[in-house]
Amino acid sequence: MNLDRNWVPMKWPCGPLEVARRNKSEQMHADVKEMLEAWGRPTGLELVKGTPINCLIVDWASGGPEDSAQQQALKPLLEAGRRLGISFVGKVALKEGVGAAVAAARAAGLSAVMLENTSGQSFDLPVILQFPRDKVAWENASTIFSSRENTWPGLGLETMKGDTAIAGPTGLPWVNSNAWFSLLSGELAPGKTVWLDFDPPDASTLLHPASYSLAFADCRAYASQWIISLDDKLRAALLRANSQAKGIWEKICETVAFFQSHREWEAFEAQGVLAVVSDFRAENAFLSGEVLNLLNRRQVQFRIIDRSRSLPASTPGLKAILWLDKEAPSPPEYSYLLAFARRGGLVIAQAYWGPPEAMPSEKNLSLHYKMYNVAKGQIAVAEKGFEDPYQVAVDTHLLVSHRNDLARLYNSEMTNCYCSGDFESPRHGNRLVQVLNYSSEPAEFVTLWVNARVGSAQLWQPGTKDARTLQGVVASPGTDFRLPSLSVYCALEFEG
């Protein structure tokens, strides 16, 4: 029995354990209790029957007196789910007795368990390890692993007044996204799949529901997986067959089905003229993570390189390297960076470690960077080091320059795009630009510019079976594409 990367996971709260938790947190209302009881019955599975959602996460053991009752109550649900082809993952939150809980899960027919750590034990059932986002043990991550303490995608509540977005420090509305962490996971745990665990905000209602489709798209566009989680009001309304709730659920399933039909995109490689290099661990984790997050907010296209592994021999299209760590590069890293600069590249660092004969010059006094000319390229060194992640992101964006953008979005400050490419398969040369709208309102009159001359592109959107051809308009030195009204997401695929 192995972990299945084709699983589409969803939280399935039910049973005595969830009831006890809600009672302790004073979140138990009559409609919530009714919902928890209904979701614990086999008939509750009608919600996911016939949908792409094929893996349910259930509480299995927490070390309390309700564990035995929980496991007994789940038996009919597990049996009915197996007949529908649904897999179950049991969440085990124990410090002691983990082995017995896992053995009980195996006997009950669960497909896997989710644990915070294995304490060096081996089990006869696949394990999904779950970590706090800032404490992921990358080298020990399971084939599928999970992180918690993630953010709900969309406009930050601190930048909202009613339905109006207020500018953040960037001068733009403050957009929350897990994109940077998904990309980081792909680099630090290659060949593995991360499940992001986060719940909808408490403010979500049927009249103003959280954007579930955006939450899912924000993960899948960057090759991670969201553990789908519904708010209590929506769960209760679905039990009553409320038409509004059914519409929200259908949109969720529509988005899931769309991404399931484009699994090949997950193998596409991130594109960008900037490489962000760090070991992304220990004392370097906070700065590097914040810089990635802020670069993404500024719509900078970048690649991530883990310096704990060998630096890549080939970096086609790369124009700049941001060396984030305080430590000077090792001799092989030094040779790599120096060769890159000598070929005309830009290296950005917080301390100078280049050739001693190079003399600094001020390229731009407002940036507070010293510029060292090295053959055809330069090393840019921050005068005060990298003290503020926000300033590092701003300065990097200015040093790399907009003229090196691979793609730009016009007429909407609450959208973002991700550029990737297929360089391995027979479709070698295909480029993909995925566009996400983080506003609760449709984005209108948005133009996507790409840095290549492209006659046309295939436009993909959830809810449509086939792509439609979108004609490009020459916008030297690239091409403009005028996008249709964008509710949540679209993707443009083209050769170039």
Regions found by a protein language model. Give the residues of each.
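Glycan-recognition and catalytic regions of carbohydrate-active enzymes
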Residues: 260-272, 288-292, 388-430
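Glycan-processing catalytic domains of CAZymes
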Residues: 1-323, 331-345, 349-360, 365-388, ...
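Short acidic/proline- and small/hydrophobic-mixed sequence motifs that coincide with surface turns
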Residues: 342, 442-444, 467
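Carbohydrate-binding surface patches
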Residues: 272-297, 336, 416-453
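Extracellular/luminal ectodomains and secreted, surface-exposed scaffolds of diverse proteins
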Residues: 466-476
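C-terminal beta-strand-rich structural cap/linker in extracellular carbohydrate-active enzymes
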Residues: 348, 475-496
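Solvent-exposed beta-hairpin/edge-strand motifs
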Residues: 449-467
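A generic structural signal for beta-strand entry/edge sites
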Residues: 377-378, 428-432, 443, 476-480, ...
